[in-house]
Design a protein with these regions (language model features):
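Short, acidic Ser/Thr/Gly-rich low-complexity loop/linker segments typical of extracellular
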Residues: 56-67, 71
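Transmembrane beta-barrel wall of Gram-negative outer-membrane proteins
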Residues: 296-405, 430, 437-454, 734-737
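Conserved C-terminal beta-signal and adjacent last beta-strands/turns
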Residues: 529-532, 536, 544-552, 557-561, ...
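Short loop/turn motifs that connect adjacent beta-strands in outer-membrane beta-barrel proteins
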Residues: 124-126, 265-271, 314-318, 378, ...
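Gram-negative outer-membrane beta-barrel transporters
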Residues: 807-815, 819-826, 830-922
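Solvent-exposed loop segments that connect transmembrane elements
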Residues: 334-355, 395-433, 478-529, 582-599, ...
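Periplasmic N-terminal accessory/gating domains of Gram-negative outer-membrane beta-barrel systems
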Residues: 88, 100, 107-109, 114-202, ...
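Outer-membrane beta-barrel signature, preferentially recognizing the C-terminal barrel domain
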Residues: 427-444, 648, 652-661, 726-727, ...
Length: 994
């Protein structure tokens, strides 16, 4: 499917290359100024320093290696100025030869900001009595200059700005960026919301290379979102958050893009080696002993970690940046979910209490190798490589107390439940003991050739990224699930208040739940042994060519940039779903008294930590490892769910290929204090989905096949041959912006861009899903249109010396063809008009909303170094942001309000910072009978360090230090639905810098 771009797509690039030939690129009365900017205090070349020729419109920002080039400079004597936040403005006078190049290097010496101090004149350098390098201040200065250089709306944060990140998860770092809220899956920061929007509207790249993501080996609505568990922060120098796009950026990010900039050895002089060893612990298991869980064995809960980095630049010709890390941490995941029936005459009724005890051990490892080689003074070859491994071992253990609403005694209240016994399985106690391993391996290669000579810059690059996620159980020694049921019994539960979780459970009648031999006795419990071993692989192939040229047009400096790009994304899902068996024992009968599951080695292990009495009840639970051993040695004691397992094995594989070809042209210029950007981009999208062409059930029955048999399936799925479904579309995207310097440190910025949101993969290559319990049929929609949007952004930014900022921003996003999931459609519209099997079922299909939907919002960001305070208080700094998102219709998972911030203190030996995030309540599900909400959540983190001389430093970091739970409610805040605790995570380390 990979093909070259059409001739029409290459025209902008050729135009950009040929246009300067008809204009003045370097007049006879002009010359060039070149040089590099270096900071001797940090031993780094300075990126994004502002270099200008006074009295002209000529201004550039230094590159990654600190180099700069000013073209079309009037010949003769000129005044050159260099500005960088937190440092004195430097200037120099030099003579520019006509048609030639003058060279001038600069060194920044010390953070020279003092309240009331005047800038140095000429080449003079202001020197403080004592200068101490502050990683925080230098990191903030880099971020501010990156933001000032950008013509789109961009926020940048250095990776060491918030101290050590527990577990190395980039998501735990990004949650402190303005306008960002993390989506958590239990204890893990999994995906990012920008301006409150769904994670699928944001893209993630490393050095501009789109990272592949296998999205939990699923093909659902989140198949396009990036999951942060597959990336590590170890080799990352800074994170760029672009909330508006330029023509050179991919257009499929209505919310914005995140680019992880890796470290570059050419950005510094000399060699740097760092090594760090650490231990991570949870207060729930603060012991050096091996203790039970996760799984059926014992593990140490205080886990080790290490980080090693090496950087060197050999004579400025060859640069090496190596990073290697590994860490492991233990997390508790304990909670309660209450099922609430709102569709009753007596009001809401709780008819199920689901307690969870899901401890897990997460291990991450990462390797980054970055190589740069200066082939000639004008040509640089580079290779960026990143490898990451993720291993998550988790126990998904649940105990459920259940009854039909009609069997909940009328005397029951929100704090007192009485479940009456029934002569069937309606009132019961369930055990579902799960155990699984999730693995992810991701690799990314990004080669690049960059040629710079005078006014011309050419970049030829490409890349390959592969992400594979797979879930295992049997191969690693256990079943995913073992389900037990105790029926024909009754139970009661009491708690202290309607919003508390301290349920006290009591068995009122029936066989004792403390004896595993009483389970699965009278009422059949089919398919009570399960396994899930699914896998998915995503790959991204990328190639691009960019050209940039500086010229003079109508007396104004103009930069013309154009490029072509092609990206192929593939996603293959090999298998999904749960295969199952019924445990019937040696007697061949599940209901026989001798058919008893093997008990867990450690009785009384289950503890949901909700203030309940479950741990004291000492309830036995099955041992999934021993049950798999029995399955392997005595397979006759397990009866396979043949039809269902065959269905999953043969029909759940799916595949999609998507190729996006793009071409763009972009213009930048400056007139006095105004910088302008204008561009246009064209993208052509082609898709191929490999899926089944399923025959309607009435046709299969009419052909003489019996439902729920394998021959029926084979005929319905056309002998399991998958067919290609093709699709495609083209769009043009405009973008532009302006920055106006109202004063030296006061900027007004306007920015706008058009973008696209492509349909989820499950619509391009999905299958029909039937839910007999809810009587629904979900049908994919391969004809779903892509969403298109227009975004407008306005911002006022004030830069506070030495390295702070205050900004107020507002935005508006207009979306056409907004996609919504599962709207009811007539049965005949999806081919089920004559199928009596689904009479009374509701058919659901994703669709596009008519008209334009609007989302508007505001964001306020503030950070400041409090250097104006006296004495030691000069070491304090503060930061924070507040955001508000307002959609014009009720949408799920939009975060309407969010805030983050913190306070930091640092001096030459000690640093400490306390940070917090807050997000308001949000709707997570809106149904006909019930709306489910997540409560507001406030979390605190802490990090710090103590230097032992100039080489070593003790480090400390804590995540969610107050153990803030994740809580949800149904309809009203007083109807608690879910409460989950994950515990704090603390890391103590020793770092050396050599």
């Amino acid at each position: 499917m990979v093909s070259l771009l059409p001739w029409s797509a290459c025209r902008p690039l050729l135009l950009a290359l040929l246009l300067p030939l008809s204009l003045s690129a370097q007049g006879a009365a002009t010359g060039r100024i070149a040089g590099r900017i270096f900071n001797p205090a940090t031993q780094e070349y300075v990126r994004n320093a502002e270099v200008s020729v006074e009295g002209t419109n000529l201004l550039v920002f230094s590159g990654d290696d600190g180099s700069y080039l000013l073209t079309n400079v009037p010949a003769g004597e000129v005044a050159l100025a260099v500005a960088y936040t937190g440092y004195d403005r430097a200037s120099a006078r030099l003579t520019v030869p006509a048609g030639g190049t003058a060279t001038r290097d600069f060194e920044l010496r010390g953070s020279t900001f003092r309240p009331g101090a005047r800038p140095a004149a000429g080449d003079a350098v202001v020197t403080l009595d004592k200068f101490v390098v502050s990683n925080e201040r230098e990191g903030n200065a880099k971020a501010i200059m990156e933001q000032r250089a950008a013509l789109n709306f961009k926020s940048v944060v250095a990776s060491d700005n918030f101290g050590d990140v527990t577990g190395g998860n980039i998501g735990e770092f990004m949650k402190y960026m303005p306008g960002v809220v993390m989506d958590y899956v239990d204890a893990d920061a999994r995906a990012v919301r920008i301006s409150g929007l769904d994670p699928k509207y944001a893209t993630v790249s490393v050095d501009g290379m789109r990272m592949a993501t296998a999205a939990s080996a699923s093909f659902g609505g989140g198949s396009r979102q990036f999951e942060f568990e597959q990336a590590s922060i170890t080799s990352i120098e800074s994170i760029e958050l672009n909330k508006t796009l330029t023509a050179s950026m991919d257009a499929d990010a209505p919310a914005g893009t995140m680019n992880l900039r890796s470290k570059n050895a050419f950005e510094r002089k000399g060699r740097e080696v760092t090594a760090q060893a650490s231990l991570t612990a949870s207060p729930y298991e603060f012991t050096l002993r091996r203790t039970p869980s996760p799984g059926d064995g014992v593990h140490r809960k205080i886990r080790p970690g290490f980080v090693f980095t090496y950087a060197d630049s050999f004579q400025g010709r060859f640069g090496v940046q190596l990073s290697l890390s590994s860490n492991s941490l233990f997390n508790e995941q304990s909670g309660l979910t209450q099922t609430i029936d709102n569709n009753t005459a007596r009001g809401p009724v709780i008819n199920a209490l689901v307690f969870r005890d899901n401890p897990k051990i997460t291990t991450r490892a990462a390797l980054g190798v970055n190589l740069d080689y200066r082939v000639t003074p004008h040509l640089i070859a580079s290779l960026r490589t990143a490898f990451s491994h993720f291993n998550d071992e988790i126990n998904a253990r649940t105990l459920t107390f259940r009854a039909n609403t009609a069997d909940i005694d009328p005397s029951s209240t929100a704090t007192s439940l009485l479940a009456r016994a029934t002569a069937n399985a309606n009132t019961r106690f369930e055990q579902n003991i799960g155990h699984s391993h999730k693995f992810n391996d991701t690799v990314t290669y990004t080669p690049k050739l960059e040629y710079r000579r005078h006014e011309l810059q050419l970049t030829l690059g490409g890349g390959y990224s592969r992400s594979t996620t797979h879930y295992e159980d049997r191969r690693t020694g256990y079943f995913t699930g073992a389900n037990n049921r105790l029926t024909r019994m009754s139970w009661s539960a009491r708690r202290s208040s309607p919003t508390s979780t301290d349920w006290q459970l009591t068995q009122l009648s029936g066989p004792a739940w403390s004896n595993l031999a009483n389970y699965n006795r009278v009422d059949a419990n089919p398919n009570n042994i399960g396994t899930v071993d699914r896998s998915g692989t995503s790959q991204v192939f990328l190639g691009y060519l960019d050209a940039k040229r500086a010229l003079l047009a109508a007396g104004l400096p103009v930069t013309v940039q154009a490029g072509v790009k092609t990206r192929l994304t593939t996603y293959d899902l090999n298998r999904t779903g749960t295969r199952s068996w019924t445990y019937v024992g040696a007697a061949g009968d599940q209901l026989n008294p001798s058919t008893v599951m093997i008990a867990h080695t450690y009785p009384g292990l289950f503890d949901p930590k909700q203030g309940d009495n479950l741990a004291a009840l000492n309830l036995p639970i099955p041992n999934t490892t021993a049950m798999l051993d029995l399955f392997r040695s005595q397979p006759s004691q397990f009866v396979e769910n043949t039809y269902n397992n065959f269905l999953i094995e043969r029909t759940t594989g799916r595949a999609i290929k998507e190729q996006v070809d793009a071409a763009y042209v972009e213009f930048n210029t400056r007139w006095r204090d105004v910088r302008l950007n204008l561009g246009v981009r064209r993208e052509r999208t082609r898709t191929v989905g490999r899926t089944f062409d399923i025959l309607p059930a009435p046709l299969v029955r009419a052909a003489g096949y019996t439902p729920n048999t394998i021959p029926f399936l084979a005929y319905q799925y056309r002998n399991f041959v998958r067919f290609n479904k093709y699709g495609g579309y083209e769009h043009d995207f405009l973008s532009g912006g302006a920055k106006y310097s109202l004063a030296r440190n006061l900027v007004l910025q306007l920015s706008a861009n058009q973008s696209i949101g492509r349909p989820d993969y499950n619509n391009l290559a999905g299958v029909i899903t039937v839910n007999d319990n809810n009587q629904t049929v979900q049908v994919p929609n391969p004809d779903l249109k892509p969403e298109t949007s227009d975004k407008y952004y306005a911002s006022v930014q004030y830069y506070i010396e030495p390295a702070g900022t205050l900004s107020v921003s507002a935005y508006r996003l207009n979306v056409r063809n907004l996609g919504v999931a599962n709207r009811p459609v007539p049965a005949e519209e999806v081919g089920y008009a004559d199928d009596p099997e689904y009479t009374g079922y509701t058919f659901l299909r994703p669709s596009n909303l008519d008209g334009v939907r609007r989302l508007k919002g505001v964001e306020v960001e503030y950070s400041q170094q409090l250097v104006f305070l006296p004495g030691f208080a000069r070491g304090f700094s503060v930061f924070g942001s507040v955001s508000r998102a307002i959609p014009d219709l009720r949408l799920t998972n939009i975060v309407p309000k969010a805030a983050n911030g913190g306070i930091r203190f640092s001096n030459h030996r000690f640093n400490l910072q306390l940070r917090s995030t807050w997000s308001s309540a949000r709707a997570t599900s809106i149904g006909v009978n019930q709306a489910q909400w997540q409560y507001e959540r406030l979390m605190f983190d802490v990090s710090g360090g103590l230097k032992l001389g100039s080489t070593y430093e003790f480090t400390l970091s804590g995540r969610n230090i107050l153990n803030s739970p994740n809580r949800g409610y149904a309809d009203e805040p007083g109807n608690l639905r879910i409460n989950m605790y994950y515990g704090a995570v603390w890391t103590l380390g020793l770092r050396g810098r050599f």
